[in-house]
Amino acid sequence: MSVVINEKRRSLLQAASSVGLLMGSGLASEAIAATTKQDPWKQAQAIIDRFAKPIHFRKEDFLVTSYGAKTCDVKPVEAWVSFVERKTLQTPVADATDCYPAIAAAIAACHAAGGGRVVIPAGNWYVAGPIVLLSNVNVHLNAGAHVYFSNNPADYAKYGKYDCGKNGKLSMTRWEGNDCLNFSSMVYAYGQRNIALTGDDWTAILDGQAGVNFADSPYCWWSWKGREKPSSVGDIAPGSGDWIKHQKGETEVSLNPLNPVSLAEVAPHLSEEKRLFIQGEGDKWRRDSNYLRALAEAGIAADKRVFGLGHFLRPHMVQFINCSNVLFQGYQVTNTPFWQHNPVGCRNVHVKNIYANSVGPNSDGFDPESCNYVLIEDSTFDTGDDCIAVDAGKGPDVQYGPSQNIVVQNCKMHSGHGAMTFGSIMSAGIQNVFAQNLVFENSHWKTDPLNIAIRFKCNMSRGGFLKNLHIRNISIPNGIRTTPAFYATLPGSVIPTKSVATSAGAVITIDCGYDPLSDNVRTRPPVVSDIHISNVNVGNVDTGAGQFSSYQAIVVLGPVPSDYNGPASPAPKIVPVKNVTISDCDLGNPVNKENPMYLFNVKDLVLKNVRVGGTVYNKTLSV
């Protein structure tokens, strides 16, 4: 049973039936197992206090110029700066010195000496390969240092640890929650400790050049997204009918003929029934983005999941895997091929005063994945996807455990899909996360509005849990997107297509049926509980049709039982979203005045002093 809360039909609320109790997860961390009764914000302060003492590095600088690095001249180039906008940027001239060898040598020398700073001075620098950090090294950009990374994919398949023949020399990476051998990220580290990426200020720039066309090609890194012409409101700037084109067959969502015609070729251990279950109907599973998921579901080892050259999975800008004592501070990243930052399985990660500035496709700002003890503060995000998304692996790839003990504070978000997001890549679970004192500016609300302010997303494929999440003191002066967007539902779903605006339009969205058509294997029901949100204040903007803050105020789509496609016996328990509290909030004036909220499969949603339009809610809802 679902309910859209309609002020003309309040009787629906009294008639809403209660549902079964939510089971706890068996993956709770020792750090928080006994803390449910104490003030959760004391837990947050304890996490913050862990970072009071900075990471120590030896007091020795290694200038990259001492190892042969030379600045380069730049020339103007017309390039994409978003999916629908081009501008004149700068790019290195054709004969620019490649500083990759010099930077790699400086890092090696610094590491061998016991650590210190590898310094990139002011100027323009061309780097045709990844900057790979080693333990006890701080790579530091002086003010005015602009590092232009090569936009040639082959340069990120030249130096990796794994020689994969025609696919290149690849690195162990993680792509949307699944491990694989692929292009290195532009800044990379694996298994290191005491490392830092720092700058003097936001004029210290790491530039991925993702919107600059490949040599002798009309396509760029962002073309690999394979996105068709957008049609929804806010996707195309006024007066523009242009968007990034792509070569047919050369995208992450194209059927790749290099991928086998049957999983039997790479996973002969699978029964035919299991193989067909993972593949699903047709050949869509042979698209690179789907093929990686299929390999993971089939139990193929990570070092046998080979992509790189001939494939189209874009690299991250910064990806550190299985590292500890990590600092990101005082620089800007821009024009990134894929996610801007993705620490995976890292411990003690401090993010301070960075500018994540890339609005291309999938340009998430900062995505800590299966990380323990993270502080993100005093930073600004302008993104083409989620500003911050807390993740925790996908499907079987949960070896790094949950994301937990994370604080986000004193940050500003301009545009993106979700300002503060949890999931959907969360198979290992997300718990004990605190977000406070944030401004979701939505400064581009006329042309590129923020889709959702506070977003929780999961589904029957990713599973996992969301619990003990606390959010307070959020200012959203320019509202969010005021038109709805939807995900297609599965055939036979109890949720009619285009009936629940979980893709865009609600200030607070808990979506347990996220994009269900994208996954063939849907056997892991998510568990969502103990979410507490307070003091969220949303402004209205003049849309021409009136003063509005959003399309709806709150959407809670609990797990949809009909999405499950696993065995009937034994079947996992599918339980409602439980114990969500929203208090002391003014969510503005939603466009959908008749139905300002939507609820499905939720137990104990507590509203305390929550103003929506002209109504103040004080009630507990179970639907």
Residue map of PLM features:
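Short glycine/acidic-rich loop motifs that flank beta-strands on beta-rich extracellular proteins
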Residues: 115, 127-130, 150-152, 209-212, ...
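Beta-rich accessory regions
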Residues: 460, 465, 472-485, 489-506, ...
